């Protein structure tokens, strides 16, 4: 199974890269967790933010192949417990399609990305910093896998 986090923003601090890679490497070979970074467009004082979001959305969708699943991470998405995420992870595994987890930039996701989503997931009603979201997603995917495999990490 292939999971990809497609996220707007690059040049993250080293601790973010280390945290992400720590959880990605803990997963078994049959569960690949990849990160695809989409460069954040420069936002000047007079920037057309709607156009920038649309461009970022186009770049995100260009990384998705036909037939792949899109799951958006949105404040107004559905909150999942660890056990519910494990259930979703198992469904995705049985579905045998690549799953693309989409995280937008500071202003969120382009409407075109949201329109293509098969599922909408909310990590929290709080606004979370994007570097932390990457690590949180990696850790929660790892934790969900440990639930499915009976590993003692999740007690």
From Swiss-Prot:
EC category name: transferase
Cellular localization per UniProt: Cytoplasm
Keyword set includes Isomerase: no
Cross-referenced NCBIfam families: PRK00103.1-4 (NF000986), tRNA_RlmH_YbeA (TIGR00246)
UniProt-listed Enzyme Commission number(s): 2.1.1.177
Catalytic activity: pseudouridine(1915) in 23S rRNA + S-adenosyl-L-methionine = N(3)-methylpseudouridine(1915) in 23S rRNA + S-adenosyl-L-homocysteine + H(+)
GO MF annotations in UniProt: rRNA (pseudouridine-N3-)-methyltransferase activity
GO cellular component, one term: cytoplasm
Name assigned to this protein: Ribosomal RNA large subunit methyltransferase H
Protein source organism: Pseudomonas putida (strain ATCC 47054 / DSM 6125 / CFBP 8728 / NCIMB 11950 / KT2440)
Superkingdom of this protein's organism: Bacteria
Binding site for S-adenosyl-L-methionine: 73, 104, 123-128
